[in-house]
Regions:
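ATP-dependent helicase/translocase motor core
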Residues: 1-184, 193
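Short amphipathic alpha-helical segment within the helicase RecA-like ATPase core
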Residues: 196
Length: 196
């Protein structure tokens, strides 16, 4: 799986990297895999468990490794834990762990790290009244922003016909891109009339 995503031992990946600061008698540990960026900084840690073990067993150990790596390199890595069948990804400063179908590439991980550093708060954003200016639309947009600020990855708005769902969605997309929370947003139109 790592090779499919472009990770290679000769260029951007290390196995059994020793780290200090672990909460054990020796104070040391060995990270199964560390994935590095082009600048030499660690982008991710991977905790690999046996195929017979639930991958989630490695979550806390992977977090401890990430703590040690961050203390040494001053950059919080993305956390992966896997058993070879299941892969979990965790950006623990941003979101809850989630199951993924594979490992991210070097560019994709770098984008996550960069976005984490560059994104701005959603709590006090300017909402363009030319797009969505009705009071209930503004409240809906603010509610979605607060939900994302709290670390949730999803938000759901239920709005009646004629209330400006499309304008509200466009305004949310604008806020997320302007604040560096999203680069690309897929908007699925439910009818041909909206699409045209």
């Amino acid at each position: 799986e790592l090779k499919i995503a472009g990770w290679d031992f000769d260029t951007n990946m290390t196995a059994e990297l020793p780290v200090s600061g672990m909460p054990n008698n020796e104070g040391t540990g060995y990270v199964d895999y560390v994935l590095f960026g082009e600048n030499g900084l660690p982008l991710a840690v991977v905790e690999a468990k046996k195929t017979s073990v639930d991958a989630r067993v490695g979550q806390n150990q992977a977090k401890l490794y990430a703590d040690c790596i961050e203390a040494e390199h001053h950059q919080r890595p993305i956390i992966y834990y896997t058993n070879g069948y299941e892969i979990y990804m965790w950006d623990d400063k941003e979101y809850a762990p989630r199951r993924v179908s594979g490992f991210y590439t070097q560019d994709e991980l770098q984008l996550l790290i960069d976005r984490r550093k560059n994104k701005q708060s959603l709590l006090h954003v300017y909402i363009d009244p030319n797009i969505a200016g009705r009071e209930y639309q503004l409240e809906a947009i603010k509610s979605v922003c607060e939900t994302f600020e709290e670390g949730h990855r999803k938000a759901l708005l239920v709005m009646a016909t004629g209330t400006g769902k499309t304008r509200t969605a466009i305004s949310i997309a604008k806020v997320l891109t302007e604040q560096n929370w999203a680069k690309n947003i897929l908007f699925l139109a439910p009818t041909i009339a909206i699409k045209n």
